[in-house]
């Protein structure tokens, strides 16, 4: 499969990486620009992300969303023992470790080398066999046809890809017939609201139907972060066009007793409007 070996050398100092500005605009952003921005942003911010969210994510927890829905309870992937699983946008491969502990054979893919270094760091600290990892763009998967039984992504890759139709086709290509593809994204309705956890995040200020990307730029106007919006209907049509059958669409409710904010996700907003959409599809 062309698996990438990530060394156990110390992680580079974040101060050695370029500092990008964060002026936010709404404008078009193509495939190449989006991919470059995503790779650079995650390389630059992986340390902070893992430090801030590492306790919630754990080293080997499979959680689908800030609402805290775990695969152990949801069982959206079905039977795992002996199944080959591709985790897309894996970050530090926490989900893949959970899958491996249940008898699956996962491969963790991410566009960010720095995120994959964190995966290696966790493996070394645990003294466990390393999770196989691959650095690649999710829209150009470096695997043979029908290489996997299952594919999954917990908030990884899909929102950052400019051409998610191509991404869906690639996932379809590498899955075996009947293979399940499950991915979670920010619920599309959230696009209409400010990304704020408080009351200011409860008033719609943008059109749900405006698909213009959200782009953060540096002083030269180069994209440093890009996120793409699709409506629920867009996602369904992408899946069907790629050859999938939609099995379920899960909108996790905010659970009682869960009081932890995650960016714009909060108990206040989560109890009023959905924050996550999980698409469950099967390859035809």
Regions found by a protein language model. Name each.
Residues 84-140:
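Class I SAM-dependent methyltransferase SAM/SAH-binding core
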Residues 165-180:
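A short glycine-rich, Lys/Arg-flanked "PGG" loop and its adjoining helix->strand segment in the class I
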Residues 215, 226-249:
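Short alpha-helix
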Residues 139-150:
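A short acidic, Gly/Pro-enriched loop at the edge of an enzyme's catalytic core
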Residues 149-165:
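A short SAM/SAH-binding and catalytic strip from SAM-dependent methyltransferases
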Residues 238-284:
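C-terminal lobe and adjacent flexible extensions of AdoMet/dcAdoMet transferase-like proteins
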Residues 2-81, 94-95, 180-215:
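Conserved class I S-adenosyl-L-methionine
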